[in-house]
From Swiss-Prot:
PANTHER family tied to this protein: LARGE RIBOSOMAL SUBUNIT PROTEIN UL30M, MITOCHONDRIAL RIBOSOMAL PROTEIN L30
Gene Ontology terms for molecular function: structural constituent of ribosome
GO biological process entries: translation
Classification via HAMAP family: Ribosomal_uL30_B
Signal peptide: none
SUPFAM superfamilies xref list: Ribosomal protein L30p/L7e
Assembly, per entry: Part of the 50S ribosomal subunit.
InterPro entries with a match to the protein in the record: Ribo_uL30_ferredoxin-like_sf, Ribosomal_uL30_bac-type, Ribosomal_uL30_ferredoxin-like
Record-linked Gene3D superfamilies: Ribosomal protein L30, ferredoxin-like fold domain
The entry's keywords: Ribonucleoprotein, Ribosomal protein
Pfam hit, one: Ribosomal_L30
Gene this chain is encoded by: rpmD
Superkingdom, natural source: Bacteria
Protein name per the record: Large ribosomal subunit protein uL30
Length: 61
């Protein structure tokens, strides 16, 4: 099974969000709006992306 690589960009601010959502952003390596990281599509990462999907733009590489 191959693991997909995803490009994740934070498009909205984390100000005023739940602490658990801020923790998910930190876990993904995102710090501020318009910051982009490339992550592997493991089940753990996909769960974090799902939880804060309203703050992100996700592209498959």
């Amino acid at each position: 099974m191959t693991v997909k690589t995803l490009r994740v960009t934070q498009v909205r601010s984390a100000n005023g969000r739940l602490e658990t959502h801020k923790a998910c952003l930190r876990g993904l390596g995102l710090r501020k709006p318009h910051h982009t990281v490339e992550v592997r599509g493991t089940p753990e990462i996909l769960g974090m992306i799902s939880k804060v999907s309203y703050l992100l733009k996700v592209e498959e590489i």
